[in-house]
Amino acid sequence: MKVLIDDKIPYIRSAAQWLLGDVDYLPGHAFGDSRQLAEADALIIRTRTHCDEALLANAHRLRFIATATIGHDHIDADYLRRRGIAWTNCPGCNAASVAQYVRNSIVKTSFSLLENREQRTENSLENREERSIHAPLTVGIVGYGHVGRAVRRAVEAMGCRVLLNDPPLEEAIRTQLRRSSISYLTPEESPSVEGVLPPEGEIEGASPSTTFVTLQEIAEQSDVITFHTPLTTGGSHPTLHLADSAFFASLRRRPVIINAARGGVVDEQALLCAHRDGLVGPMVIDTWEGEPNINSHLLREAFIATPHIAGYSADGKSCATRMALRAVCRHFGIPIDDEAQFLALTAPPSLPPEVQPSGRWADDALTLYDPLLDTARLKASPATFEQQRGTYPLRRETFE
């Protein structure tokens, strides 16, 4: 069996050689120029490789593609289905990294938040021995997939109250419950979901006890609003400009706005107007409309501005590599006989020995990742957005 692998996928070479044997590496853009493609049984790729008929017409042996990414817009699923080629992506591989970004951004904006609520006291983040940032902020999470769930865990650990909004997921849960001929009057009346709902992943985060609120409630009650939806233009719940001028006009608490979803989920012109009108507090922008040619006015006014790197941690890349390799092994019936060896071969690099936790959670969080450092680089050189993203030094999520 021959496997072709994108040569920019980190932490994969030793494990791939150990598990798969006959492995070749190519730049993502060079797969179409390679005679090796005709001999490949499997590909492990990134978004740079567009898997469609133009690329794969002569790949007669190909049976499986794993993309070591969450996104799969570069996969022509209909064509692969017609060809009988199986494929997978790596959903949730960088969810913890995005959650780290959101949590640390909240830490950096917390003093402004406390001023908004007139609760900046000695018990706030100035006393970093405290576990919670104060009693408590309300964080509205829009989009409750893998990333939204990771964000919820991260901010609840800080002592925050959480509001959830995800109409498609809420409808999917209701539909599944109707099919099961079971209805619940309140979350408290809900029995165990075992045997009622499909396993997590078929309906992400599905549980009849999950409480959702409307976007209007998010707008009225939240101190922080963070977006984690895909960008969609059709269907009953399109997300293009989900946060528009009407949404910003309904805000009540001058919240922090965080967009680490997709550029276009937030209407940037409406956001700028709302910020200038005092409706919005600090702005945290990682995903931009028109990338890499980003809005210079928004860049200037954003408190945190980064080049679409919220998910760029070494831990997340390691997770994607592991998921992709496991998928190939599962598809071809290749056993992973030594799990400890597999994890060791795909592990991200350790931090320098001088980088040690202090025991003060906020300090430790910012030691691992301070988003203002990335902000300074982007504001100094916005024209190098794509270069900064492509050469980003992968951060660690933990001290381990």
Protein language model regions, located:
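Intrinsic disorder/low-complexity segments
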Residues: 114-135, 174-211
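N-terminal glycine-/charge-rich "phosphate-binding" loop or analogous flexible N-terminal tail
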Residues: 1-40
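Phosphate-coordination loops involved in phosphoryl transfer and adenosine-cofactor binding
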Residues: 62, 135-138, 254
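NAD(P)-binding Rossmann-fold cofactor-contacting core
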Residues: 30, 158-177
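Phosphate-binding beta-alpha-beta segment of Rossmann-like dinucleotide-binding domains, i.e.
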Residues: 85-153
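Rossmann-like adenosine-cofactor binding region
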Residues: 51, 171-176, 180-187, 208-296
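Phosphate/diphosphate ligand-binding glycine-rich loop within oxidoreductases
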Residues: 42-116
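Rossmann-like dinucleotide-binding domain for NAD(H)/NADP(H)
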Residues: 254-400
